[in-house]
Amino acid sequence: MFTVFLLVVLATTGVSFTLDRASDGGNAVAKKSDVTARFNWRCCLIPACRRNHKKFCG
């Protein structure tokens, strides 16, 4: 009985750990797009940068 309990605990921990790693990757992608958006916004405030990156500023 203890062996079955131990196997269930280990299996659950493994699944939880794997799901946590996958969500961290998603957060990294979201953070990267947020940084890109902030760069684009700041760039559009600077005339020289705005001229060089017209596709971002419209």
UniProtKB/Swiss-Prot annotation:
Is Ribosomal protein one of the keywords? no
Which Pfam families would you find in this protein's record? Toxin_8 (PF07365)
Which keywords does the record carry? Answer: Acetylcholine receptor inhibiting toxin, Amidation, Disulfide bond, G-protein coupled receptor impairing toxin, Neurotoxin, Postsynaptic neurotoxin, Secreted, Signal, Toxin
Task: Quote a single Gene Ontology cellular component term.
Answer: host cell postsynaptic membrane
Renumbered to this chain, region (Lacks the Ser-Xaa-Pro motif that is crucial for potent interaction with nAChR) spans 45-47
Signal peptide feature range: 1-16
Q: In which tissues is it expressed?
A: Expressed by the venom duct.
- Cysteine amide is found on 57
Q: What is the effect of changing residue 45 to A?
A: Little loss in inhibition
Q: Which region ranges are annotated with the description Interaction with ADRA1B?
A: 40-42
List cystine links: 43-49, 44-57
Q: Where in the cell is it found?
A: Secreted
> Which residues comprise the propeptide?
17-38
Q: Which domain of life is it from?
A: Eukaryota
Q: What else is known?
A: Negative results: has no effect on alpha-2 adrenergic receptors (ADRA2).
Its job = Allosteric inhibitor of alpha-1B adrenergic receptors (ADRA1B). Binds to an allosteric modulatory site on transmembrane helix 6 and 7 at the base of extracellular loop 3 of ADRA1B. Also weakly inhibits alpha-1A (ADRA1A) and alpha-1D (ADRA1D) adrenergic receptors in a competitive manner. Potently inhibits contractions of vas deferens, spleen and aorta in response to noradrenaline. May also inhibits nicotinic acetylcholine receptors with a possible distinct nAChR binding mode from other alpha-conotoxins, due to a different three residue motif (lacks the Ser-Xaa-Pro motif).
**UniProt free text on domains:** The cysteine framework is I (CC-C-C). Alpha4/7 pattern.
Name of the protein this chain belongs to: Rho-conotoxin TIA
Q: Which organism is it from?
A: Conus tulipa (Fish-hunting cone snail)
- Taxonomic lineage per UniProt? Eukaryota, Metazoa, Spiralia, Lophotrochozoa, Mollusca
